[in-house]
From Swiss-Prot:
Reactions it catalyzes: a quinone + NADH + 5 H(+)(in) = a quinol + NAD(+) + 4 H(+)(out)
Record EC number: 7.1.1.-
Lineage of origin: Bacteria, Pseudomonadati, Pseudomonadota, Alphaproteobacteria, Rickettsiales
Residue intervals passing through the bilayer: 12-32, 40-60, 72-92
InterPro entries in alphabetical order: NADH_UbQ_OxRdtase_chain4L/K, NUOK/Mnh_C1-like
Membrane topology annotation: Multi-pass membrane protein
Family: Belongs to the complex I subunit 4L family.
Official protein name in the record: NADH-quinone oxidoreductase subunit K
Any one biological process term the GO annotation gives: ATP synthesis coupled electron transport
Organism: Rickettsia bellii (strain RML369-C)
GO cellular component, one term: plasma membrane
Task of the protein: NDH-1 shuttles electrons from NADH, via FMN and iron-sulfur (Fe-S) centers, to quinones in the respiratory chain. The immediate electron acceptor for the enzyme in this species is believed to be ubiquinone. Couples the redox reaction to proton translocation (for every two electrons transferred, four hydrogen ions are translocated across the cytoplasmic membrane), and thus conserves the redox energy in a proton gradient.
Length: 109
């Protein structure tokens, strides 16, 4: 029985193309949905995911674990950042009733 090595079929170029597509989708989402703050946060998360795909792809290609470890650290920090951002948005929505970027821009102390 032959064990398949996926590195023979899926090369570094495939991961880089996937990463660039995910980053482009995140960038387009950031530019096209500038009114809703939740869509902006999701687009930023997509862009961070694309960077993590790059780290993992180069880590596998170079046969080092540092890129994968760094990717896990970035995912942990991004999850904490997103949860804090969504908690702030939830409190703001309860007080003001809207989460549009134009309304948040006009916040005053």
């Amino acid at each position: 029985m032959r064990i398949l090595n996926m590195n023979e079929y899926i090369g570094l170029n495939h991961y880089l193309i996937l990463s660039s597509l995910v980053f482009t989708i995140g960038m387009l989402g950031l530019f096209m949905h500038r009114k809703n703050i939740i869509n902006i946060l999701m687009s930023i998360e997509l862009m961070l995911l694309a960077v993590n795909i790059n780290f993992v792809a180069f880590s596998v290609y170079m046969q080092e674990l540092s890129g994968q470890i760094f990717s896990i650290i970035i995912l942990t920090i991004a999850a904490a950042e997103t949860s804090i951002g969504l908690a702030i948005l939830l409190i703001y929505f309860r007080n003001k009733g809207s989460i549009e970027v134009t309304d948040i821009n006009q916040m005053r102390g």
